Amino acid sequence: MEATLENGFAKVAAGDWLMGRAQPAACLGSATTKGLKGFIVPDRACVRAVTCAGDAWCGAADRPFLTRLDALPDVPLVLVSAKLLVAPFGARAGARCVKLVPFSFNRATPVTEFKLGWAVAGTKSRVTRVALEDGATLTVRPESMVAWTGKDPTGFCPKLSVLDILLPRGPRTLAWNFHGPCVVWFEGTQEESVRPRGWRR
């Protein structure tokens, strides 16, 4: 199947196969519709197949990796990939964004969790999913990756750059505090809730 390139991206119909060559580097791509943008972090592997109700986008010949999945509301979305990490940082107007921060590239395989059309790929069955109610707090010491919806976490979680995604420079003692309402996906250790700094009864 040959896809037609439009503005540097190949638009592929639902159910078609997408293939890409290995390229262990991050690629900053932007979709040409709806103003969505995201960091694409391939992990030395190929996109195997994409099935969705909408359209799937993959890069040009020199950037052959998937850049975004746009699914219709309440429609199942399936991503089949050997190793792929996607870190979106843009969201639809009036919607929450799913953010994924990879700390390791050596064990990535898909996890079937999707929110607002974005694919969250993780590590086999080691990813834990926690839904926090309003006012609840979750402290995580991540080993490999963290994804979340809602507010940004507090604690030792500085603003990330491309170099942080490619070459993680943070210590192993990262402790991130997530505050509900939100949903958190993570690989690592879940600790007892910690009161935010300056919190009083």
State the predicted function of each range.
Residues 1-201:
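Phosphate/adenylate-binding glycine loop and adjacent helical scaffold
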